[in-house]
Design a protein with these regions (language model features):
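A structured beta-alpha segment of the ubiquitous adenosine-cofactor-binding alpha/beta core
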Residues: 37-42, 187-197
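Conserved N-terminal glycine-rich FAD pyrophosphate-binding loop of Rossmann-like flavoproteins
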Residues: 1-31, 216-220, 225
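Conserved FAD-binding subdomain of flavin-dependent enzymes
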Residues: 12-68, 158-159, 237
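Glycine-rich loop(s) and the adjacent beta-strand/alpha-helix scaffold that form part
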Residues: 143-150, 162, 190-238
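Conserved redox-cofactor binding core of oxidoreductases
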Residues: 50-191
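Solvent-exposed alpha-helices and their adjacent loops that cap or buttress functional pockets
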Residues: 2-3, 160, 179, 195-198
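Short coil/turn connectors at secondary-structure junctions
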Residues: 5-6, 163, 182, 199-201
């Protein structure tokens, strides 16, 4: 889903805000979250996101996995809600990313049939004109420079490949492995074989949603969802 989205990263009190002296507070961020969650998120999850979000961005940026820039004046979506910021800062855009650096992995990132050669901040949505010099656009096309969600996922993928992190395609997550009340891994199906993968530090759930799985939609969503805008592979299993 992220690969065909605008790729905006939304984090309160993020490092870019701190560098530019844009004010934000833990209290405002939590108030904004709680005005939107319909009482369905627990405080531990909300507070962990607000308290550690900036640190997570700093960690990934220092390792080349992110290159983010403030979308000047890009407001929170629900401005009438408590804690909302009207002057921007929390929303971050991705610098263009060179997909040729991915080698054979460059065609593994889903495009949905469209590749954007601009940063969001260059478009009217991000405060820009939406116009790029033809010679510059030619350079971007020839160099396979991509923006938006493609840049976000491409850069994360490159950081993983640079560290020889094994990436399994066409792999379905089946269940989480528990030991003494702790999640220690996951059982997956890869190449028709069910395999247990053990984790030393934790398991990150980043499966992209489940809006194409009828059973999960019926179980977990409050109402019908008939026309998802995401890839049909979003079935909740990775």
């Amino acid at each position: 889903t992220a690969a065909i989205s605008g790729g905006i990263v939304w984090v309160p009190s993020n490092p870019s805000m701190q560098e530019k002296g844009i004010s934000d507070s833990r209290e405002d961020a939590l108030a904004y979250f709680r005005s939107l969650d319909h009482g369905e998120m627990n405080d531990d999850s909300l507070e962990a996101f607000v308290d550690e979000g900036a640190n997570a961005l700093q960690f990934l940026t220092e390792r080349g996995a992110l290159d983010l820039h403030i979308l000047n004046g890009y407001p929170d979506y629900y401005l009438d809600n408590p804690g909302a910021k009207s002057d921007g800062g929390r929303a971050l855009d991705n610098a263009l990313f060179d997909f040729t650096s991915l080698g054979d992995w460059s065609d593994k990132v889903y495009t949905g049939g469209e590749i954007v050669r601009m940063m969001l901040l260059e478009t009217p949505l991000g405060g820009g004109s939406g116009i790029v010099d033809p010679e510059e656009m030619k350079r971007r096309v020839q160099g396979d420079l991509r923006g938006w969600g493609q840049a976000l996922i491409g850069r994360l993928l490159k950081a993983a490949l640079d560290r020889d992190i094994e990436i399994l395609l066409e792999t379905t997550a089946r269940k989480l492995e528990l030991l003494d009340g702790r999640i220690v891994g996951a059982t997956v199906t890869h190449g028709g074989v069910e395999t247990a993968i053990h984790a030393r530090r934790g398991v990150v759930l980043a499966t992209g949603g489940f809006e194409w799985d009828k059973e999960l939609k019926t179980t977990f969503l409050r109402g019908p969802l008939t026309s998802p805008a995401s890839p049909p592979t979003n079935t909740g299993d990775g």
